[in-house]
Every structure is written in structure tokens, then in C-alpha cells.
Amino acid sequence: PVLRGFEANRVLIVVDGVRMNNAIYRSGHLQNVITLDPNVQNRVEVLYGAGSVMYGSDALGGVMHFQTKNAEFAQNGKFQASGGAFTRFSGANSEKSLHANVNLGWAKWASLTSVTASDFGDLRAGRRGNPFQSFEWQRNVYAARLNNRDTALVNARPEVQIGSAYRQLDLLQKVAYRPNAYTTHTLNLQYSTSSDVPRYDRLSETGANGRPSFAEWYYGPPKRLFANYSWQ
């Protein structure tokens, strides 16, 4: 994300009150925010401008505070269970996603479990464009490994951005204990992993001969393990 012209290690990402930025965050483009499952977010606060006084270092351009859903207790003291699930298919990137969540609530205990698995294919742009503009966005050639050699192949469908596909898995588990009406203990566990995330802007570069400059250029695979205990 870019806030007020700043990005990467100049924009602070906070998850459930815990800063996500660390010492290895570089100043170039970052994809760490994709490790946050949008299906478990309760609210997202975006603060534009410097916020280092309140949130600490790295908040030069702004702050993005992600707050995930909480485990819900039974309202009437009796056991309550709720949940939801969905599947999603998308033609623009051949997306196949599956999400399921279950909430179990008692008078003093509560549990929230969430699982999201996604398989994103290569992005596909529209075939028709402005004839008065260039078509540099088209993927006319791509690199592949054939017979143990890097080979440039012609893309039969230039609107398909070959090399932009990846897979992702997101898990969340929250356990809450409320001994009385004034105190709540919460254990928050989150895990996210994915396949290699292609850096498409590099893979789409071509040399003077029209061939791809790079056969492979990946981010990751990024893995995020989050564990937090809170007492309210």
C-alpha cells in the first residue's frame, strides 16, 4: 500500500495491536499485506500521515491497523454454535477460493476457527483496448524451461499475464476465557503461507531482441506466524 507517497517500511502495518513491520522490511515494494485474510477482518483503520508518536517507528506515511473478528460468547449462558462458508470463482484470474469459519460459545469460553484456501491463476486483461494507446501491457512472449534450457515462447493469448499465478492458505484460531463480566483472556493464533509470488513487473521485461529478460523472479514464499495473548 502507498499512503501519502510512502510505501514499504515507511507505512506501518498493525495486526490486532501488534506491529507487523520488522527489521528486514526493505524500502522497495512489499507484498506482506496479502498474508492478512480479508475474510476474518472485523475492521480496518487507515491513518494518513505521520503516526510515529502514537504507533512508533515506520509510521511516516501512515498506519494501517487490521483488527480481526473476536470469538463470541453465548448470550444466554447456554452453548451456541455458528459458522459460515463460501466458495468463490473468478474468471479474470481463474480464482478458486474456499472459506469456512466456526464459532463455539459458552458462558465463559469461546472459540473461533477460520480457514481460507485460494488458488489464483494468471491474470487476464481485456482483449479490446484504446487503439490510440500502446499495448505494452500485453504479454506477447514468456520464458519457460524446456529440455533444461530457458526458452522464449510466443503467448497465444497476449491478454493473459503468464507468470502472475500463486496459491495461498490462511488459518486463524482464537480462544477466549471470561471468568467474570470484567475480565477476558484471549489467545490469538494466525498462520499464513503461500506459494512463490511472482514479481510480474520483472518477468514482463524484455530485452532489445524482444525476449524476456528474466525467466524467474519470485517473492517468498512468504510465511507469517502470529501468536498473541491479551488480557482485557
Predicted features along the sequence, with ranges:
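Flexible loop and strand-edge segments within Gram-negative outer membrane beta-barrel domains
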Residues: 162-170, 176-232
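Outer-envelope beta-barrel architecture signal
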Residues: 11, 77-83, 96-98, 107-111, ...
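Transmembrane beta-barrel strands of outer-membrane/channel proteins
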Residues: 85-91, 104, 113-119, 187-191
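Short acidic/polar hinge/loop motifs at secondary-structure boundaries
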Residues: 20-50
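Surface-exposed beta-strand-turn/loop segments characteristic
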Residues: 112-167
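N-terminal periplasmic accessory domains that precede
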Residues: 1-2, 13-14, 30-34, 46, ...
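Outer-membrane beta-barrel proteins
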Residues: 22, 96, 120-126, 184, ...
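Extracytoplasmic beta-strand/coil segments of soluble accessory domains associated
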Residues: 1-19, 42
